Amino acid sequence: MTRLCLPRPEAREDPIPVPPRGLGAGEGSGSPVRPPVSTWGPSWAQLLDSVLWLGALGLTIQAVFSTTGPALLLLLVSFLTFDLLHRPAGHTLPQRKLLTRGQSQGAGEGPGQQEALLLQMGTVSGQLSLQDALLLLLMGLGPLLRACGMPLTLLGLAFCLHPWA
C-alpha cells in the first residue's frame, strides 16, 4: 500500500485570544470569545450570490414577459380572429356518410362493424382577397415589431371588423 505523505498544515496565529481549557463554565478572562470571521465569509458570499441570482431571475422574467409574451398573445389573437372571420359560409359541422354493407372501412374492421362514420369537411376557396392580405400583413407585423407593432395589429383588426371592409 502506498501512502501519500503531505506536509502538515502549520498552526496559524489567531488574532482573537482563546481562553485556556482549564476554566469552568461561566469563568473566563472577561472578554467574549468569537470565532474568526473574514470579511468575505460564507454569509457575505451567500448573500451576494442570492442577490445576483434574484437580479438575474428578475431580468429574465422581465425579458420574457415584455417581449415574447405579448408577441405570442398577438399571434394567437390574429389566428383566432382570422379563423372566426373567414370560416366557410356553408355548414360548419362535418357531414356524416355511412358506408353500405359491401364497402370496407379499412384496418381494424371486425365482424358486425360494417357501418363507419366518415367525416367530410367543407372546402375553402384558395383565393386571397385584398382585405385578407392586408389583415395578414398587419397582424403578422405586430408580433415581429413587438411593442411598436401593437398599433399595426390593432389597425389590422379594426380594418377587418369595419363594416365597409
Curated annotation (Swiss-Prot):
Q: Keywords in UniProt for this one?
A: Membrane, Transmembrane, Transmembrane helix
InterPro entries, per the entry? C20orf141-like (IPR040425)
Entry annotated with the keyword Transmembrane helix: yes
Which domain of life does the protein's organism represent?
Eukaryota
Q: Where is this region: Disordered?
A: 1-36
Q: Name one Pfam family in it.
A: DUF5562
Localisation per UniProt entry:
Membrane
Listed transmembrane segments: 135-155
Q: What is its main location?
A: membrane
Describe its membrane topology: Single-pass membrane protein
According to the UniProt record, one GO cellular component term is:
membrane
> What name does this protein carry?
Uncharacterized protein C20orf141
